[in-house]
Structure formats: structure tokens, C-alpha cells
């Protein structure tokens, strides 16, 4: 009885019953017409019944399609939910690694601090959205007060690679290695200068004591090196700096580790501020491009200054700038506006100037640059 009820309720059974009924009804109606043969009546009735079966087949196929679409949608939602859970787990793990690494930067053991820095760099590599935050943490570590015996030694600047046998305390030497690790990791996290798709990350090294800082060939957003101690050598050659660059009062005035400052073929897309910067050795800006306002006001070039083939697309200030060594100011493109006021040079050195500039001798044996 139960099977019979199920069969009666089945759409398939109803379809066949309706098809049979239609076959009988159409066939019986056509047989009443004397001009219609029995075979034609059966054929027409069969077509009518078959049409019902065909309609049922179409409905059944559409129903199966909708069921399959709903199943796929449920499967997609389940997959998305699993992906969100996995992503949340990754974020939680990254947050925990980041927080733990930052905490370990305050550890007394230098090897623990080095490990914490590498862990932070690992977080940035696996989670690119952490890169700027990790760079901020590494820069803040370098901004911590630090001194070394070599930075305090008096005497003339010689080979920046030669410490003249001067070593710091064990704590200073260990801390120096930690700081050099931080500098290397910063460089590793910065994109290449020719990577058009990569963002420019900001660096805030205000007041930091850095040694052998080499950011060459990297893309940088905004860079702050105000009042920074630039020991040994500093290399920004081939950099592409998207944001403002501030080197105000940076440099190294004491110690034997006064090195060169290389900025060859560097592109400054916004303002570049070198006001009060002290270049203790050679400063190489050859082929650089300054797209924004450029300021060397009160800057001191104790060594040679090479600005040959530099391109200026905006203004340049050499207000009370002092050149102590050889000078080459034969620009590739002259600035739109120029400020020269007591721009001093040593006339005994080799001086190369644009055709419209000249030297004006002074009573003390020095000379200043003026526009002819």
C-alpha cells in the first residue's frame, strides 16, 4: 500500500498517466471524424502524449541543473569559509610572531635581538602588508642612542675601512653587529628601484647612528636622515626616492670613520633637503636627478664634490654652502631658480663651473661663486 501511495505521488507516474489520458482523449476525438484513419488518430495521440513526456524530461533536467548549482554554491561558500578561517589563523599567527619579536628586541642578549629581527623580516616576507610596520620597527631600533669608540676618536678622517686598531667595549661591538643586521634587513625588504609595481616604503632614521648604510638600487618612499650620524660610507646610488628626502644636519663631524657619500644616478622625485649636512669625505652626486626643490643651504663639503651631469628641474639653493675640495658643478640641466650667497670654495683646488658662473676672490684667500 505504501509503495502504491509513493507511486501515485510520483511526478513520473502522473506524467505517464497524463500522457496516456491525452493519447486516449486525442485518439478518441479524432476517431469520431470519418475522414481520419485509425493509424493517423493513434499517431496524433501518441505525439500529444509524447509531448507531455518531453516536457516532463525538460522540467526534470532543469530541476537537476538547479540542484547542482545549489550544491556548487554551498560548496563554494564552504570553501570560502575555510579560506577565511585559514586566513584568520595566518593573521593570528603573524600577529603573535610580530608581537613576540618586538618584545624580544628588548632582550639583553644580542643573539636574541638578531633572531627577533630576522623573525620580523620573515613576517614581512610572508605578509607583505606588514612590511612598512616592520621597517618602522627596524628604523626605530637604529634610532636608539648608540656610540662607539671609533666615532669619538679625534684626528683626521682616513680610510673609512681602517679602524686604526680602535675597538669598542664588548657591549659596543656586539650592539654594532645587531645594528648592522638591522640595516641589512632594511635593504632586503626594500623593492628594487626599477620595480614599477612595488610600493615605496618610508624610512625614518632621524638621529640614527648608521655605518656602511647601503641603500643603492632601491625604491624608497619618504626618507628621513635628519641629524643622523653617517659613519664609514653611505651609498644611495641608483635609488629612486618617491617622497621627500631630508638629510638636514646629517653627517659625521667626529671620529675616524668619516666616509664617502655616494648618490650617483639617484632620482629624487620630490624635494631633497641637505641643509646643514656635513660631507666629511667625497660626495658623489654625478648623474643624479632632482625633480623637486633642492637645498644645500649651510652644507659643508669637506672633501671633493662631484655634481657633474646633475639634472635640476626645479630650484637650487647653495646659500652659504662651503666646498673644501675639488668641485664640479657642470650640471646637465641647470635649475630654474638659483640661490648663491657666500658659496665658498678653495681656489687652490680644481673648480669646474657652468659658463655663466665665476669665482670672486676674497681677502682671506678664499673665493666665492657668483653669477657672471
Pin down the residues of each PLM region.
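Short, Lys/Arg-rich, polar N-terminal cytosolic tail immediately upstream
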Residues: 1-2
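N-terminal leader/targeting and pre-domain segments
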Residues: 75, 84-87, 96-104, 108-121, ...
Amino acid at each position: 500500500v505504501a509503495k502504491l501511495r509513493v507511486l501515485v505521488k510520483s511526478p513520473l507516474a502522473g506524467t505517464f498517466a497524463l500522457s496516456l489520458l491525452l493519447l486516449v482523449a486525442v485518439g478518441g476525438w479524432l476517431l469520431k471524424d470519418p475522414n481520419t484513419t485509425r493509424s493517423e488518430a493513434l499517431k496524433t495521440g501518441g505525439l500529444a502524449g509524447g509531448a507531455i513526456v518531453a516536457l516532463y524530461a525538460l522540467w526534470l533536467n532543469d530541476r537537476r541543473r538547479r540542484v547542482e548549482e545549489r550544491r556548487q554554491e554551498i560548496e563554494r561558500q564552504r570553501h570560502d569559509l575555510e579560506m577565511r578561517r585559514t586566513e584568520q589563523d595566518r593573521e593570528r599567527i603573524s600577529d603573535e610572531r610580530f608581537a613576540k619579536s618586538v618584545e624580544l628586541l628588548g632582550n639583553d642578549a644580542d643573539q636574541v635581538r638578531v633572531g627577533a629581527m630576522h623573525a620580523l623580516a620573515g613576517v614581512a616576507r610572508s605578509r607583505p602588508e606588514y612590511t612598512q610596520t616592520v621597517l618602522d620597527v627596524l628604523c626605530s631600533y637604529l634610532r636608539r642612542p648608540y656610540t662607539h669608540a671609533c666615532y669619538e676618536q679625534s684626528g683626521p678622517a682616513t680610510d673609512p675601512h681602517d679602524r686604526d686598531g680602535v675597538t669598542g667595549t664588548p657591549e659596543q661591538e656586539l650592539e654594532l653587529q645587531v645594528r648592522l643586521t638591522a640595516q641589512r634587513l632594511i635593504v632586503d625588504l626594500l623593492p628594487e628601484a626599477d620595480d614599477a609595481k612595488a610600493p615605496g616604503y618610508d624610512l625614518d632614521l632621524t638621529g640614527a647612528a648608521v655605518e656602511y648604510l647601503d641603500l643603492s638600487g632601491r625604491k624608497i618612499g619618504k626618507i628621513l636622515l635628519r641629524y643622523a650620524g653617517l659613519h664609514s660610507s653611505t651609498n644611495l646610488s641608483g635609488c629612486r626616492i618617491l617622497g621627500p628626502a631630508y638629510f638636514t644636519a646629517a653627517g659625521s663631524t667626529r671620529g675616524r670613520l668619516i666616509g664617502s657619500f655616494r648618490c650617483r644616478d639617484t632620482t629624487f622625485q620630490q624635494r631633497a633637503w641637505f641643509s646643514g649636512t656635513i660631507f666629511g669625505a667625497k660626495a658623489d652626486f654625478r648623474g643624479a636627478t632632482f625633480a623637486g626643490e633642492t637645498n644645500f643651504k649651510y652644507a659643508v663639503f669637506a672633501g671633493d664634490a662631484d655634481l657633474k651631469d646633475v639634472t635640476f628641474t626645479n630650484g637650487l639653493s647653495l646659500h652659504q654652502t662651503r666646498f673644501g675640495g675639488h668641485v664640479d658643478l657642470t650640471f646637465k640641466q641647470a635649475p630654474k631658480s638659483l640661490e648663491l650667497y657666500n658659496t665658498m670654495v678653495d681656489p687652490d683646488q680644481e673648480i669646474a663651473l657652468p659658463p655663466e658662473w665665476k669665482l670672486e676672490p676674497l681677502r682671506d684667500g678664499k673665493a666665492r661663486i657668483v653669477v657672471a
